[in-house]
Amino acid sequence: GTDKRQFRHFQTVKFEDLNNLVLSKERKGVGLLGYAVDKGVELNKGRIGAKEGPNAIKKAFAGLPDLNQCEEIVDYGNVEHSHEHLIETQEEYAILAAKSIKNHSQTFLLGGGHDIAYAQYLATRKVFPNQSIGVINIDAHFDTRDEDESTSGTSFRQILEQDEQADYLVLGISQGGNTQGLFDYAKQKEIQYVFADELLHQVS
């Protein structure tokens, strides 16, 4: 039918290629870009499978009713890991994500491993080169490991080491899930954090 009040999102989403995108004069609508990558999780010795996340999220979203007759939604597909080093994939993703951020009122970046955080930061910094950036991470771990290469556990350290205009807040920290070295680094970098049991106390 043509009654948009009956539509679900799979009937309204458009599909485009960011490589061919011509930027509009004003930011409007919503962009979706998947990060179908779990190489960083593998490098961090975690359980792989996160690369299936973007398609799973999109599939669930597609069946939801378009209750508010949303602004135009454009799905730009997924970026997959095809480079020798993860940082190259993160940089590729950042270039594409920045295009979506410039073109739309809202952009949703769908992971994927937690290394999407650094790619998302790079994209945001491309669009807003001089503004301060606030990062909120809901996680039991700081993900500020000191490694020789980018992994799912290094994103926020990478951000803080290269950007004095970035602030970092972590909600849900596990006292037993982070080493003393990570707590020391949090103090050094003035990372704000709330323990998981404090959050549970607030909602109980």
Whereabouts are the PLM-identified features?
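Conserved alpha-helical scaffold segments that buttress catalytic/binding sites
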Residues: 2-35, 39-204
